[in-house]
Design a protein with these regions (language model features):
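Short coil-to-helix segment of the ABC ATPase nucleotide-binding domain corresponding to the Q-loop/switch region
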Residues: 47-55
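Conserved ABC transporter NBD signature motif
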Residues: 10-18
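Conserved ABC ATPase signature
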Residues: 88-92, 96-98
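Conserved signature/switch motifs of ABC ATPase nucleotide-binding domains
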Residues: 87-90, 108, 140
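Helix-to-loop junction immediately C-terminal to a conserved catalytic motif
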Residues: 2
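Catalytic Walker B motif of ABC-type/P-loop ATPase nucleotide-binding domains
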Residues: 113-116
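Helix N-cap at the start of a conserved alpha-helix in ABC-type nucleotide-binding domains
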Residues: 124-126
Length: 191
């Protein structure tokens, strides 16, 4: 979805980019429209949380210091980490690091957030809080595409479900949607 692998068969389009014919020089433009949440965080360990976020903004063209500061404060508040900007990543718990990664992913108000196993390294309670945060972000306008092996999450946060197998993506939403209970009523009315 973010241009890392070539499309082998069929067609794929992401945010108006044909992934079969996208030129390498256009991949950075596509990626600026995406937010990526890595399972293993990928935070810069020698920089504070604030500096990690500032690095992304500057790399994507932000120049105004006050606007950068305001945006960082805004996303840290969104993920419940407004008091953690001065911390280094190794001073944070796994759940806190994942929240910072989500803050980084939403910095540029992406149309799509790709979340690769965002709960994979977290305890159950923290994992649910992370999925709830992603669910709230989705409700505010960004699409969230999340990979998971935790099938319980699919029941608690229903949505479209796809399975990747044999180099294909198959819609399996019906397998995970709650079944509607129906009651048949036979009205036998004699006139």
């Amino acid at each position: 979805l973010y241009g890392e692998l070539d499309v082998i068969d069929g067609e794929a389009e992401v945010l108006g980019y044909n992934m079969r014919s996208i030129k390498r020089k256009h991949i950075p433009q596509l990626r600026r429209k995406l937010g990526i949440v890595f399972q293993d965080f990928q935070l810069l360990t020698d920089r504070t949380v604030y500096n990690n976020l500032e690095f992304v903004l500057r790399a994507t063209g932000w120049k105004n210091k006050q606007e950068i500061q305001d945006r960082i404060e805004e996303v840290l508040q969104l993920v419940g980490m407004s008091n953690k900007g001065y911390k280094l990543p190794n001073e944070l718990s796994g759940g806190e690091q994942q929240r910072i990664v989500i803050a980084r992913a939403v910095l540029n108000s992406p149309a799509i957030i790709l979340a690769d196993e965002p709960t994979g390294n977290l305890d159950v309670e923290t994992g649910k809080a992370i999925v709830e945060l992603l669910h709230n972000i989705c409700e505010s306008g960004s699409s969230v595409v999340m990979t998971t092996h935790n099938l319980q999450l699919l029941k608690e946060y229903p949505g479209r479900v796809y399975r990747c197998a044999d180099h294909q993506i198959v819609d399996v939403t019906a397998e995970y949607m709650p079944r509607q209970r129906t009651i048949e009523i036979d009205l036998n009315i004699d006139n």
